């Protein structure tokens, strides 16, 4: 093919992963990132692969679909997984990272790579000079989004998601919280803020009546279930919170807890969990408390949480609009455009939802862009694997009802033979098959 490089637009998780996979295969990359010359509403730094919502890569067990996907990515030499592993922070059975250390590591490795040229500028049109991976994310600039939407017949999709507040640990009242992971799984990694029924009811009332930051009048409120604002969840009813981010099961009071409780109950009525957000352990985020409340309201309402009475918020929660494509119509399983075979898309804009899923899409798109450059057939991972099932799902879903999707065992091809009734055993069997099939596919 008569060209000497591949473009990658956007240095988020997907773009960073794509650029690395291309360069690893000996092909020069021009990696474009506008942060540094033009800010986005949500990013705080100019580092690559910045985490703008939670600092968690979610479950790490192979009986969890995202845990399986992470293991597959490790075996495929993912730069995102490698940097994440190097900057882990305690999170029980989950994988969480020091967001700044991790992002700096990804940035440094790509900046130092001899085949990666970093170009800090905004791209406003779809390049025609070379094979291109577009990974501009859900916060794609308006000018480029218009060009991408033109591929979609002008019909763009969107949803809103939000980020949770972060507090300074030194301002937490440690007499009202206790360190524990749910069911004592893994190390004790979460600060737990227990509530009595009276405290919970007062908190719920304050949350459901608090003032939200306004949306544009012409935009409907449309949320992705996995990142729903806590106030929207609260308005669905008390049980939604008690069976969701504030569920108390597995978080019994420690024997030495001296705070208020309901009678002799060993388990609180509700619990708010705080998760370590940086390696130093000086910052904690409020787990599951993505929010779109006005900042003053966040301070008022969230200081009702036991232990946070005088907490200082180093970052308030924010909400932003995310755009995504009609992937069932527009993309192949290799994340290649059906309309322009020299064009690939990756990341949340394709309808994959989550950090790990975005990295996975970037890995697949990057590998396939490199294979096109070398005039090789694209890789289509088997849908018995997590990394194969995700692109299969987003390219085979019903276009009329297509919405972003996290990886889960429900989208991975079922096992052959009689159904294994025990869920843990079934998931273990799916994971074992996935890793075996991935290894076999890569040796063909």
Swiss-Prot record:
Q: Which HAMAP family match?
A: TrmFO
User: Could you say which cofactors this protein requires?
Assistant: FAD
Q: What is its EC number?
A: 2.1.1.74
Residues that bind FAD, according to the entry?
A: 10-15
Cellular component per GO?
cytosol
Q: Which gene specifies this protein's sequence?
A: trmFO
This chain belongs to the protein called Methylenetetrahydrofolate--tRNA-(uracil-5-)-methyltransferase TrmFO
Q: Name one Pfam family in it.
A: GIDA
- Signal peptide start and end residues: none
Q: Which domain of life is it from?
A: Bacteria
Q: Broadest EC class?
A: transferase
Its GO biological process terms? tRNA methylation; tRNA wobble uridine modification
Q: Which reaction does it catalyse?
A: uridine(54) in tRNA + (6R)-5,10-methylene-5,6,7,8-tetrahydrofolate + NADH + H(+) = 5-methyluridine(54) in tRNA + (6S)-5,6,7,8-tetrahydrofolate + NAD(+); uridine(54) in tRNA + (6R)-5,10-methylene-5,6,7,8-tetrahydrofolate + NADPH + H(+) = 5-methyluridine(54) in tRNA + (6S)-5,6,7,8-tetrahydrofolate + NADP(+)
Q: Summarize the protein's role.
A: Catalyzes the folate-dependent formation of 5-methyl-uridine at position 54 (M-5-U54) in all tRNAs.
The answer to keyword Transmembrane helix applying to this record is no
Q: Where in the cell is it found?
A: Cytoplasm
UniProt lists the family membership as follows: Belongs to the MnmG family. TrmFO subfamily.
Alphabetized Gene3D superfamilies for the sequence: FAD/NAD(P)-binding domain (3.50.50.60)
Does the keyword Protein biosynthesis feature in the UniProt annotation? no
Annotated keywords: Cytoplasm, FAD, Flavoprotein, Methyltransferase, NAD, NADP, Transferase, tRNA processing
Q: Which GO terms describe its molecular function?
A: flavin adenine dinucleotide binding; tRNA (uracil(54)-C5)-methyltransferase activity, 5,10-methylenetetrahydrofolate-dependent
């Amino acid at each position: 093919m008569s060209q000497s490089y591949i473009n990658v637009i956007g240095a988020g998780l997907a773009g960073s992963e794509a650029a690395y996979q291309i360069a690893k295969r000996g092909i020069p990359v021009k990696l474009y990132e506008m942060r540094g010359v033009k800010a986005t509403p949500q990013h705080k730094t100019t580092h690559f692969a910045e985490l703008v919502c939670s600092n968690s890569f979610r479950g790490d067990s192979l009986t969890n679909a995202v845990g399986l996907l992470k293991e597959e990515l490790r075996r495929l030499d993912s730069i995102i997984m490698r940097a994440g592993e190097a900057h882990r922070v305690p999170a029980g059975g989950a994988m969480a990272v020091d967001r700044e250390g991790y992002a700096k590591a990804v940035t440094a490795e790509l900046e130092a790579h001899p085949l990666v040229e970093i170009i800090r500028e905004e791209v406003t049109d779809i390049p025609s000079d070379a094979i291109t991976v577009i990974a501009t994310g859900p916060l794609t600039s308006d000018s480029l989004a218009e060009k991408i939407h033109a591929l979609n017949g002008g019909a763009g999709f969107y949803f809103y998601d939000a980020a949770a507040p972060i507090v300074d640990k030194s301002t937490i009242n440690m007499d009202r919280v206790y360190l524990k992971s749910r069911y004592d799984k893994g190390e004790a990694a979460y600060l737990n803020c227990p509530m009595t029924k009276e405290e919970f009811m007062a908190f719920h009332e304050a949350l459901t009546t608090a003032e939200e930051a306004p949306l544009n009048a012409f935009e409907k409120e449309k949320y992705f279930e996995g990142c729903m604002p806590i106030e929207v969840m609260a308005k669905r009813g008390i049980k939604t919170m008690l069976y969701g981010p504030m569920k108390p099961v597995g978080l019994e009071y420690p024997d030495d807890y001296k705070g208020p409780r309901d009678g002799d109950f060993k388990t609180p009525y509700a619990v708010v969990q705080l998760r370590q957000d940086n390696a130093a352990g000086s910052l904690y985020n409020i787990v599951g408390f993505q929010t779109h409340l006005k900042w003053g309201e966040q301070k008022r309402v969230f200081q009702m949480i036991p232990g946070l009475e005088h907490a200082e918020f180093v970052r308030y929660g924010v909400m932003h609009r995310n755009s995504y494509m009609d992937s069932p119509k527009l993309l192949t399983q290799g994340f290649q455009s059906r309309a322009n075979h020299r064009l690939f898309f990756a990341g949340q804009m394709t309808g994959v939802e989550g950090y790990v899923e975005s990295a996975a899409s970037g890995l697949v798109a990057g590998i396939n862009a490199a294979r096109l450059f070398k005039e090789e057939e694209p890789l289509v991972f088997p849908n018995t694997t997590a990394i194969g099932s995700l692109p299969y799902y987003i390219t085979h879903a019903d276009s009329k009802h297509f919405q972003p999707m996290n990886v889960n065992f429900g989208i991975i091809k079922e096992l052959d033979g009689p159904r294994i009734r025990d869920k843990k055993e079934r998931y273990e069997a799916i994971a074992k098959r996935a890793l075996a099939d991935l290894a076999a596919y890569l040796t063909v």
